[in-house]
UniProtKB/Swiss-Prot annotation:
The lineage of its organism: Bacteria, Pseudomonadati, Pseudomonadota, Betaproteobacteria, Burkholderiales. This is Serine hydroxymethyltransferase. The keyword Magnesium does not apply. GO terms for biological process: glycine biosynthetic process from serine; tetrahydrofolate interconversion. Catalyzes the reversible interconversion of serine and glycine with tetrahydrofolate (THF) serving as the one-carbon carrier. This reaction serves as the major source of one-carbon groups required for the biosynthesis of purines, thymidylate, methionine, and other important biomolecules. Also exhibits THF-independent aldolase activity toward beta-hydroxyamino acids, producing glycine and aldehydes, via a retro-aldol mechanism. It comes from Bordetella pertussis (strain Tohama I / ATCC BAA-589 / NCTC 13251). It is an enzyme of class 2 (transferase).
């Protein structure tokens, strides 16, 4: 039998040591990677329970294994809470990731070779929206759409391509697009031309839940998402759909592309969804956007160019070409200053994907630790200070000291 009193540091000190160092890094650094956030202790506790031991192929009330009466309760709570947050008719909480959620929708309604419209990866889309290196781009005939001359989503192009190519499905959503997406307009284009409409809100889900970004659920046939990022849950995925597609989507997830669901993760999803229904989460989502706008505005005042000129969400792309520094270099020097960002291609980027001409910044994690407008403005100025003198080690050290003071004052996991 197992001894309940044995702790990880006793069983595996090597893994424990690495975890402790990562804990220190997360506490000391300002996290600005737009896809990252901090899960609550309750979410992490749920994910570390005995539910990890339970196989539960199937769905609540219709399992292929016995002993599922309690995990059925957990999964149904997750489903019901997700539907309540977004006003969805039906939901599946079993996808292990956002990519698998997207794959599940594709498998439910498409055949290999079917035509699909998706946002170009080069202009802000996601790998699973038809990138040639991704399974979606290999299995289906994806036609990319992008931005207009003002770096705004080109709805006229979407309509033109829809009429020309007659896709079976149009996919909206992005991994690096700062503005609101007009989901109602996109849905009208799709449905007026006989196409289904899917929205991937992996990046925006927490903002939608908090009323800080438009909700696509009333307009879309399918809405997919991750459960981490701005939603602040465990790493995983979900699908919401019109009731008429529930059976097809459920069959596509299991037995189509997955076997037994990760019940410990679904428990953590249920906890995160309860948190997202709270008034405090509404305030959080609004603050994420406020912080992002201050961050972007301050960077512009410091001479940096923001793609699309502004942000209306949690995320922004910074074009570094006027600074004469690549995204790869900026990521490295900002990391030395304890500011964590990711290099990111800008629209029509001349640099290679591992180099890039830009960085992507996001405010979900900084907001979770209690940053407000004043801290967002300070963070932007610290970023600009580093990028003004990226090879000055004394300058980087001075910024790092100020970052450490700020993060010590506002810890992620306080007492």
């Amino acid at each position: 039998m197992f001894n309940r009193n044995l702790t990880l540091d006793q069983v595996d000190p090597d893994v424990w040591a690495a975890i402790q160092k990562e804990d220190v890094r997360q506490e000391q650094h300002i996290e600005l990677i737009a896809s990252e956030n901090y899960a609550s202790p309750a979410v992490m506790q749920a994910q570390g329970t005995q539910l990890t031991n339970k196989y539960a192929e199937g769905y609540p009330g219709k399992r292929y294994y016995g002993g599922c009466e309690y995990v059925d309760v957990v999964e149904q709570l997750a489903i019901d809470r997700l539907k309540q947050i977004f006003g969805a008719e039906a939901a599946n909480v079993q996808p292990n990731s956002g990519s698998q959620a997207n794959q599940g929708v594709y498998m439910a309604v498409l055949k290999p070779g079917d035509t699909v419209l998706g946002m170009s990866l080069a202009e802000g889309g996601h790998l699973t929206h038809g990138a040639s290196v991704n399974a979606s781009g290999k299995l289906y005939n994806f036609v990319p759409y992008g931005l207009d001359a003002d770096e705004v989503l080109d709805y006229a192009q979407v309509e033109r391509l829809t009429k020309e190519h007659k896709p079976k499905l149009i996919v909206a959503g992005a991994s690096a697009y700062a503005l609101h997406i007009d989901f109602e307009r996109m849905a009208r284009i799709a449905h007026d031309n006989g196409a289904l409409f899917m929205v991937d809100i992996a990046h925006y889900a927490g903002l939608v839940a908090g009323g800080a970004y438009p909700n696509p659920v009333p307009h879309a046939d399918f809405v997919t998402s991750t459960t981490h990022k701005s939603l602040r849950g465990p790493r995983g995925g979900v699908i919401m759909m019109k009731a008429e597609f529930e059976k097809a989507v459920n069959s596509a997830i299991f037995p189509g592309i997955q076997g037994g669901p990760l019940m410990h993760v679904i428990a953590a999803k249920a906890v995160a969804f309860k948190e997202a229904l709270s008034p405090e989460f509404q305030d959080y989502a609004q603050q994420v956007v406020k912080n992002a706008k201050v961050l972007a505005d301050t960077l512009v005042k410091r001479g940096l160019r923001i793609v699309s000129g502004r942000t209306e969400s949690h995320v922004m792309l910074v074009d570094l070409r006027p600074k004469g520094i690549t995204g790869k270099e900026a990521e490295a020097v900002l990391g030395q200053a304890h500011i964590t960002v990711n290099k990111n291609a800008i629209p029509n980027d001349p640099e290679k994907p591992f180099v890039t001409s830009g960085i992507r910044l996001g405010t979900p994690a900084m907001t979770t630790r209690g940053f407000k407008e004043a801290e967002a403005e300070l963070t932007a100025n610290l970023i600009a200070d580093v990028l003004d003198n990226p090879r000055d080690e004394a300058n980087i050290a001075a910024v790092r000291a100020r970052v450490n003071e700020l993060t010590a004052r506002l810890p992620v996991y306080g007492n």
